[in-house]
Amino acid sequence: MGYNYFEIIAGEFEMTDIHFIETSGEYKKLGDSARIWSSGTWDVSLKKANSLIGGRIFLHTSQKGPSFLCGEIIDVEEATTGRVTFIFRHDRSLVNTLVGENDGNWGQEQITVNR
């Protein structure tokens, strides 16, 4: 699942959230469930993506804009080398989340935030 067993036991486990600037419109609902979504493909290594399972994904239209689609990451799929698709369970209560000024710096299209 991407969790480090020893960090959990030692009480040092932090969940990591990932935020993306979504401009391609590749995200989509999967099947008949309104809650399971695919994020579209992102420039994230498979190793890093797997470590994010259990964390949360947030899609934004801009760095300063609120999230519009978000939820708990439940799986990842390798799309192409170095790119992955996140499968997540939508959580309406997370919509309109902003990235705080103290959360770090955005890369070109993403930022990870420990919580």
Predicted regions located by residue number:
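Structured alpha/beta reader/binder surfaces that contact nucleic acids or chromatin modification marks
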Residues: 6, 12-115
